Structures are given as structure tokens and as C-alpha cells.
């Protein structure tokens, strides 16, 4: 479910809204059951975090299957670069959400107190992503800037 979209107040008042929080182990177990296989057979451990939901993990796996990408042998930086270079985000809206999540995950994995420059880049790109979503700006310039400034490619 994409809860980022605005819902009219009249509709919202007539709906039940369930907020479910899963632990890390619950997310992994649910995903394993949905796949009928271990999640680690599909994904590099770098992609699995405490914030991962079964839906996000399944979307990532489906994306990899459709695009013939082996996520087990690919790291996060390489996957982000591949999505940006191949412009996969232009073909499917769900890929945009995926790449935004991957960018945030990249920063979360690499930001440290000692690296002030990366913390500043993290804040800068979070604001830029928010503005891109809010004002419907061009994603390509955002992703190219991220690739150049952060991934250094």
C-alpha cells in the first residue's frame, strides 16, 4: 500500500487505518514464508535492515527478477548505480520509491559522526528528495547529482 498519497478527508473519515509494526525477525519470517525460501538466498545482507518491511523486500526481489539482476552478489552502491545508469526509474513508478529507499539506506549504512561531509550530504539529499516528490521535479537530475557527488562515479 502506498500511503504517501493524500486521501480526501471525507474518504479518510470512513476508512479504518491499521498501523502495524513488525520486528526485524517478524519481517524476515513473513518474507521467508511468502518466498517459500530463505531471504538470504535472494538478497545480500546489506539490503536487509531493521527498517525493511516484507513488501519492500518482495518488491526489491521482483525488481531483480524482472531485470535479471543478482542481488545476492551485488552491493548497495552498485545497485543504485545500475538503476540510475539504466534509467529503470523512468519505466516504473515503484522503482522510484525503491531507489529513494536505497539512497536513504546507503546513507544510513555509511554515515558516521566522524564523516561530517557525508552527514551534510545526507541532509541535503533528503531535502532534495522531499522537494522532488512534493513539487514533482525531475528525478533524473537528482539521481545524476547523487551519483556524481556521493557515489563518485
Listing of model-derived features with the role each one plays in the protein:
Residues 16-28:
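Conserved AAA+ ATPase "SRH/arginine-finger" region at the nucleotide-binding site
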Amino acid at each position: 500500500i502506498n500511503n504517501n498519497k493524500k486521501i480526501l478527508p471525507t474518504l479518510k473519515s470512513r476508512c479504518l487505518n491499521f498501523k502495524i509494526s513488525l520486528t526485524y525477525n517478524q519481517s524476515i519470517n513473513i518474507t521467508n514464508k511468502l518466498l517459500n525460501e530463505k531471504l538470504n538466498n535472494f538478497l545480500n545482507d546489506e539490503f536487509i535492515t531493521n527498517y525493511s518491511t516484507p513488501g519492500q523486500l518482495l518488491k526489491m526481489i521482483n525488481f531483480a527478477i524482472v531485470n535479471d539482476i543478482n542481488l545476492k552478489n551485488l552491493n548497495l552502491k552498485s545497485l543504485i548505480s545500475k538503476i540510475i545508469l539504466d534509467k529503470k526509474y523512468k519505466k516504473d513508478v515503484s522503482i522510484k520509491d525503491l531507489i529513494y529507499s536505497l539512497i536513504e539506506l546507503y546513507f544510513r549504512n555509511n554515515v558516521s559522526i566522524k564523516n561530517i561531509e557525508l552527514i551534510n550530504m545526507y541532509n541535503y539529499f533528503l531535502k532534495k528528495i522531499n522537494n522532488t516528490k512534493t513539487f514533482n521535479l525531475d528525478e533524473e537530475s537528482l539521481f545524476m547529482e547523487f551519483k556524481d557527488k556521493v557515489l563518485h562515479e
